[in-house]
Design a protein with these regions (language model features):
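N-terminal strand-loop element at the rim of the active site
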Residues: 2-39, 199-205
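Donor nucleotide-sugar binding/catalytic pocket of nucleotide-sugar-dependent glycosyltransferases
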Residues: 28, 103-143
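Acidic donor-binding loop of glycosyltransferase active sites
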Residues: 56-58, 233-249, 255-259
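Short His-centered aromatic/hydrophobic patch
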Residues: 61-67, 85
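A conserved, positively charged/aromatic
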Residues: 75-110, 114, 121, 235
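A short helix/loop element that forms part of the nucleotide-sugar donor recognition site in Leloir-type
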Residues: 140-154
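Conserved donor-binding/catalytic core segment of Leloir-type glycosyltransferases
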Residues: 154-175, 179-182, 195
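Nucleotide-activated donor-binding/catalytic signature segment of Leloir-type glycosyltransferases, i.e.
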Residues: 197, 206-228
Length: 288
């Protein structure tokens, strides 16, 4: 948008819709969130209309369901079609054959490029590897977080650990492990506060665990914020960040120590010796 392109976004909605609209980016609500056949048919109709009405020049998809639908539309409408591969999808149960990677694919790391070539036999020339771009003005050591500290009851002498991730069942393992470790961490540090940021289909289970630990400790050590857009302010008060991928890079930009850990692997406290594996796996530690 800043570079003069007219950007149109379609999604099932979420916390970032207002931010998009405030930036002058048009958003269309399309039920792209699951494999429900009725939703997929409705999405196909809506996407076809949007592409025609908005005179879209390039279509870019980021997930399996929209890519599948847009792949079918692409064959009839002949628009340029690009996808981004953010992680390694399950290829079993026939899922490989409903995955469409478009005419060209952007992979977020070298291991994802290898995955695409090995599992989908994509030519190397059709895959471009990029990195997550971080807004270093938004994510910086200078971020003012006084409003967040007031909202969450964080005191200046609190030892804050922040965890950021989607809390889907496929992503929430480390959130649960961190919560399980809180009683031991609480013995080792003063005034512990753990902020868990994110939402998803496993949120209620994570919250139940957090409530149980808080009850045992007799105070609200763990705070779940749900989905948020002010991630920079939630990172700012922490002494340690736990997470992967873009969120881990955002914490690094804010000059925070980062433990890289997720459902796909663990490489521990990040330092220069772990830079190569971080870059190769988009800081998701796949296979580690």
């Amino acid at each position: 948008k800043r570079n003069g392109f007219n950007v149109i976004v379609t999604s099932n909605g979420g916390v970032y819709v207002k931010e998009l609209e405030d930036a002058g980016i048009k958003h269309y609500a399309v039920p792209l969130q699951n494999k429900n056949p009725l939703n997929m048919l409705k999405s196909a109709r809506l996407l076809k209309k949007i592409i025609k009405d908005e005179k879209i020049d390039i279509v870019h998809s980021h997930a399996r369901i929209p890519s599948f639908i847009l792949g079918k539309l692409h064959k009839r409408m002949k628009f340029p079609f690009v996808t981004t591969a953010h992680w390694a999808f399950n290829t079993g149960y026939g899922l490989k054959y409903i995955t469409d990677w478009g005419e060209k694919t952007v992979a977020v790391s070298e291991d994802i490029k290898t995955y695409l070539m090995d599992n989908y036999h994509m030519p190397a020339g059709d895959i471009n590897v990029t990195i997550n771009g971080i807004d270093t003005e938004k994510f910086s050591p200078k971020t003012d977080c006084e409003d967040i500290k007031k909202e969450l009851g964080i005191k200046d002498d609190d030892t804050v650990i922040t965890y950021v991730s989607r809390l889907d069942e496929s992503r929430s393992l480390v959130a649960k492990q961190l919560i399980e470790a809180v009683p031991e961490i609480d013995k080792a540090v003063d005034n512990l506060k753990v902020i868990v940021v994110g939402a998803g289909d496993d949120y209620n289970n994570v919250k139940t665990m957090a409530d149980s630990v808080n009850q045992k400790l007799g105070r609200d050590v763990i705070v779940l914020t749900g989905a948020r857009t002010d991630i920079n302010k939630l990172i700012a008060p922490c002494k340690l960040f736990v997470g992967v991928s873009r969120a881990a890079l955002e914490a690094m930009a804010a000059d925070k120590p980062v433990i890289i850990a997720g459902n796909e692997g663990y490489i521990g406290l990040f330092d220069e010796s772990k830079l190569a594996v971080g870059i190769d796996t988009n800081f998701c530690c796949r296979g580690w």
